[in-house]
UniProtKB/Swiss-Prot annotation:
SMART domains named among the record's database cross-references: PCRF
Protein name: Peptide chain release factor 1
Organism: Actinobacillus pleuropneumoniae serotype 7 (strain AP76)
PTM characteristics: Methylated by PrmC. Methylation increases the termination efficiency of RF1.
HAMAP family recorded: Rel_fac_1
InterPro entries hit by this protein: PCRF, Pep_chain_release_fac_I, Pep_chain_release_fac_I_sf, Prokaryotic/Mito_RF, RF-1
Family designation: Belongs to the prokaryotic/mitochondrial release factor family.
GO molecular function: translation release factor activity, codon specific
Gene3D superfamilies: 3.30.160.20, 3.30.70.1660, 6.10.140.1950
Modified residues (N5-methylglutamine): Q235
Function: Peptide chain release factor 1 directs the termination of translation in response to the peptide chain termination codons UAG and UAA.
Gene: prfA
Length: 360
């Protein structure tokens, strides 16, 4: 392992010890804001320090075992121990490099998940409902909480658009690679000839920003319209103008919310989503500027950015970004999507490591 990496790990170990002492300091214990901040930093360093300590111990054990190589009675056992330790050290070094990769500060945040029906008419709306069910099941398995922000139901079932907030540990970091175009190939229930149709939905995942990080939005840049909440088919389900539509004039971003009976609550929810969308648009612009030399696995949420195909006749799901295909469509649609999410995260980390190597 490079000296620069070892030096970085040593400094993190020192910081870990320093934090341990601070967390036992009465003045810190009595200051809840400081205590929370130090506790969070301490827990974030825990894995890297534990792994580094293991790495150091194995290297020390190898040095001791090498002395025994001169002893005929111990030579075979020592050689075996050295080989085992070297294999583990190799794995630990790779893991440590991943742990040292720059962290996306948004990864620990809650997230807004937006699913919009695209091409395909009613079938696209039904597929949007299927995707929402898939993500809901996944969230249940992670014990994350889902709160509906806005839903525009489709007449044949499913949704024209649905936005939910997902709360839990590391939600955005786990789901951010789901952004992009999702395509389905299947025979619709309404298809009498048995022909396979292709429909599409767009998924966008945005971090829920804390108030301190929300962009300043000039009230004069907003157009706020109110109207009566409506269900599938357009029928009104409320007698007051509680639904809210907010347009951010400079960017053209439009957010609607009609989930709550209170206009005030709908407005607050819509503003929270709007703030995240504005930040996302700016981040996408910056990413596009940097994407000339390196591929971007983070989907843009653009309809043309096709990331995944769900093929029902063949029972397969294909992720086009890394050419991954799994033949467990039923399990995937029931929320077992870790086998799609984790390979993308691993590939992203590999790209980051490659970029760091080029800079070194």
């Amino acid at each position: 392992m490079k000296d620069s990496i070892i030096n970085k790990l040593e400094s993190l170990s020192e910081r870990h010890e320093e934090l341990q002492a601070l967390l036992g300091d009465p003045s810190v214990i009595n200051d809840q804001d400081k205590f929370r901040a130090y506790s969070k930093e301490y827990s974030q360093l825990e894995e890297v320090v534990t792994t580094f300590n293991r790495w150091k111990k194995l290297n020390s054990d190898i040095e001791e075992a090498q002395i025994l190589l001169d002893d005929p009675d111990m030579k075979e056992m020592a050689a075996e121990e050295i080989a085992e330790n070297k294999a583990e050290i190799e794995n630990l070094e790779q893991h440590l490099q991943i742990l040292l990769l720059p962290k996306d500060p948004n990864d620990e945040y809650n997230a807004f998940l937006e699913i919009r029906a695209g091409t395909g008419g009613d079938e696209a709306g039904i597929f949007a409902g299927d995707l929402y069910r898939m993500y809901s099941r996944y969230c249940e398995s992670k014990r994350w909480r889902i709160e509906e922000m806005s839903a525009n139901e489709s007449e044949q079932g499913g949704y024209k658009e649905i936005i939910v907030k997902i709360s839990g540990e590391g939600v955005y970091g786990q789901l951010k690679f789901e952004s992009g175009g999702h395509r389905v190939q299947r025979v619709p229930k309404t298809e009498s000839q048995g022909r396979i149709h292709t429909s599409a939905c767009t998924v966008a995942v945005m971090p829920e920003l804390p108030e301190s990080e929300m962009p300043e939005i000039n009230p004069t840049d907003l157009r706020i319209d109110t109207y009566r909440s409506s269900g599938a088919g357009g029928q009104h389900v409320n007698t007051t103008d509680s639904a809210v539509r907010i347009t951010h004039i400079p960017t053209g971003i439009v957010v609607e919310c009609q989930d709550e009976r209170s206009q005030h609550k709908n407005k607050a929810k819509a503003l929270a989503v709007l703030a995240s969308r504005i930040v996302q648009v700016e981040q996408e612009r910056q990413a596009a500027e940097q994407a000339d030399t390196r591929r971007n696995l983070l989907g843009s949420g653009d309809r043309s950015d096709k990331i995944r195909t769900y093929n029902y006749p063949q029972g397969r799901v294909t992720d086009h970004r890394i050419n991954l295909t799994v033949y467990r469509l039923d399990e995937v649609m029931n929320g077992k999507i870790d086998e799609l999410i984790q390979p993308i995260i691993t590939e992203y980390q590999a790209d980051q490591l490659a970029a760091l190597s080029e800079q070194a």
